[in-house]
Amino acid sequence: MKKTGILNSHLAKLADDLGHTDRVCIGDLGLPVPNGIPKIDLSLTSGIPSFQEVLDIYLENILVEKVILAEEIKEANPDQLSRLLAKLDNSVSIEYVSHDHLKQMTQDVKAVIRTGENTPYSNIILQSGVII
């Protein structure tokens, strides 16, 4: 049995299988998941687990070269945005797109991780980097 790292077997496998430029989405309660895209549903109840808790664990375990966020988070959820940006390494590039475009982009992710987050625009697409 694992003692450290990601203990959820679905999340661990997802992280282990990521290659350079592969993408994963961490989403709030309301983010729709396209047909055919795996959904790893971690939500227990409204707010649990939080977007930030899930993001923290994933950032500890995968190398991220780019993140994609909804432009709307800047005005609708600035506290979430500032906490999120504080966690990113300076080398991570940040792209803002419309929320509608971000939802379209989830059609090309390896999986959507659904959290219990209940604040607006708490969605992010993480693009995997490479360690060599």
UniProtKB/Swiss-Prot annotation:
Subcellular locations according to the entry: Cytoplasm
GO CC annotations, alphabetized: cytosol
HAMAP family registered for this protein in UniProt: D_rib_pyranase
One GO-annotated biological process of the protein: D-ribose catabolic process
Protein name according to UniProt: D-ribose pyranase
Subunit structure comment from the entry: Homodecamer.
Reactions catalysed: beta-D-ribopyranose = beta-D-ribofuranose
SUPFAM superfamilies in the cross-refs: RbsD-like
Superkingdom in the source lineage: Bacteria
Gene3D superfamilies noted in UniProt: RbsD-like domain
Isomerase is among the record's keywords: yes
Pfam families, A to Z: RbsD_FucU (PF05025)
GO molecular function: D-ribose pyranase activity; intramolecular lyase activity; monosaccharide binding
InterPro entries: D-ribose_pyranase, RbsD-like_sf, RbsD_FucU
Family under the similarity heading: Belongs to the RbsD / FucU family. RbsD subfamily.
Catalytic residues, chain numbering: H20
Entry binding sites for substrate: D28, H99, Y121, S122, N123
Top-level EC class: isomerase
Keywords: Carbohydrate metabolism, Cytoplasm, Isomerase
